[in-house]
């Protein structure tokens, strides 16, 4: 008997129950979609993020390979959902070691972004809550909606799928009855996720008549904190190398974004205006909030002040507001340069210089007064009395 078989079948295991509130714990896991592609005869890889309380899929992503991009896209999808709904940051995430360990000392370090982070032990699939939820989605939705879902060794006939064996030199090649395009498989799985989320929660005794999504929305943990976007975007956002131009703005993806204040310039390294910009694009590719770093240190959150119409005859109230905001930032820069300007050099009169040269330094006598012992004793007694009174 292998160690894995012994651990899953014979070794005692802990008994747990789900939390009371949504977003108290999010569990991540990957899986292969059950049907194969026409072009590669391989199964697409999917990555899901489940809320443990509601069992909702709150983030998902797809790739042809199980790689880091798959994980990053799943995190991005989850945080986009949170942004759209105004939800705060999950209290805990439960992740695997294989693809997540590279972030153990960065944003997946407990207390950095998430208060609690659990890395599940390798080869211990029963530890992750996402594992049985993958099965629940497959049994309740996928088997109902699609043909060819199952495994050839399944005990239950309705969960069994058959393949045609091909006689070749490998003697281990099987052909599916039907293959599918990438677009079809991904769209159908996204539809399955939506159906799974909006089906009744399995614990109808506790949540009568409520769907998984309704449980998610109505039971959000009240102690959750807002997402620290500056940290999040640095690790899973898009990265653009740029520079601060004219002491006022950075150009990111052909868009000029202004510094929040000219005082940000004081935080730059000497003679270095090169910075790194990070942002998380939405579903339409829009940038949203953009943060700039230099040498790993957060400098500022940029803002899109916009441009105004140069023709006064065509200016709207929005144009005037943009012009006012730009002029405010320019005025702040002018005030800062005036405040930090070096005083102008003046020419000293010749006779004043001669007087200074002829002047002789004289020692200054400082009179010291010997302390009166009676006064010191009285002061000490008064200090001690006040200390006793304070207690």
Located regions from the model:
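Short, flexible loop/turn elements at secondary-structure junctions
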Residues: 29-34, 50-54, 64-66, 97-99, ...
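Active-site beta-loop-alpha junctions of metal-dependent nucleic acid enzymes
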Residues: 60-86
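Intrinsically disordered terminal and processing segments
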Residues: 1-22, 110-116, 122, 131, ...
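Extended, compositionally biased alpha-helical segments that mediate assembly or anchoring
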Residues: 299-391
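Residue-level signal for well-ordered, solvent-exposed loop/turn and beta-edge residues enriched
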Residues: 55-56, 297
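Globin-like tetrapyrrole-binding proteins
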Residues: 87-91, 95-226
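Mobile-element integrase/transposase regions
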Residues: 1-48, 56, 70-74
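C-terminal, beta-rich DNA-binding module of retroviral/retroelements integrases
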Residues: 180-340
């Amino acid at each position: 008997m292998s160690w894995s078989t012994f651990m899953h079948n014979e070794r005692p295991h802990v008994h747990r129950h789900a939390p009371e509130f949504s977003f108290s714990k999010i569990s991540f896991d990957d899986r292969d979609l059950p049907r194969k592609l026409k072009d590669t005869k391989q199964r697409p890889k999917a990555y899901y993020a489940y809320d443990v309380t509601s069992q909702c899929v709150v983030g998902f992503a797809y790739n042809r390979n199980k790689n880091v991009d798959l994980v990053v896209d799943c995190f991005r999808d989850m945080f986009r959902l949170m942004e759209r709904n105004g939800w705060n940051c999950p209290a805990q995430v439960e992740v695997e070691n294989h693809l997540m360990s590279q972030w153990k000392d960065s944003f997946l370090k407990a207390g950095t972004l998430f208060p609690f982070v659990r890395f599940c032990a390798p080869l211990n699939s029963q530890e992750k809550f996402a594992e049985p939820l993958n099965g629940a989605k497959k049994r309740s939705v996928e088997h109902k909606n699609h043909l060819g879902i199952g495994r050839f060794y399944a005990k239950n006939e309705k969960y069994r799928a058959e393949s045609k064996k091909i006689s070749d030199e490998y003697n281990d090649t099987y052909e599916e009855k039907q293959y599918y395009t990438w677009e079809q498989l991904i769209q159908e799985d996204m539809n399955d996720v939506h159906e799974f989320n909006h089906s009744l929660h399995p614990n109808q005794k506790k949540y009568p008549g409520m769907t998984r999504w309704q449980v998610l929305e109505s039971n959000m943990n009240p102690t959750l904190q807002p997402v620290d976007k500056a940290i999040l975007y640095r690790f899973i956002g898009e990265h653009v190398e740029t520079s601060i131009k004219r002491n006022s703005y950075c150009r990111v993806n052909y868009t000029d974004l202004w510094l929040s204040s000219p005082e940000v310039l004081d935080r730059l390294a000497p003679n270095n205006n090169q910075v790194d910009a990070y942002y998380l694009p939405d579903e339409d590719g829009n940038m949203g909030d953009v943060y700039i770093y230099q040498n790993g240190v957060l400098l500022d959150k940029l803002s899109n002040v916009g441009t105004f119409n140069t023709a006064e005859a065509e200016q709207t109230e929005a144009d005037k507001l943009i012009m006012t905001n730009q002029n405010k930032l320019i005025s702040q820069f002018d005030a800062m340069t005036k405040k930090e300007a070096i005083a102008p050099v003046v020419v000293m009169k010749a006779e004043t210089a001669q007087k200074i040269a002829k002047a002789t330094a004289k020692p200054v006598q400082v009179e010291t007064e010997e302390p009166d012992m009676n006064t010191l004793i009285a002061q000490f007694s008064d200090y001690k009395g006040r200390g006793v009174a304070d207690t």
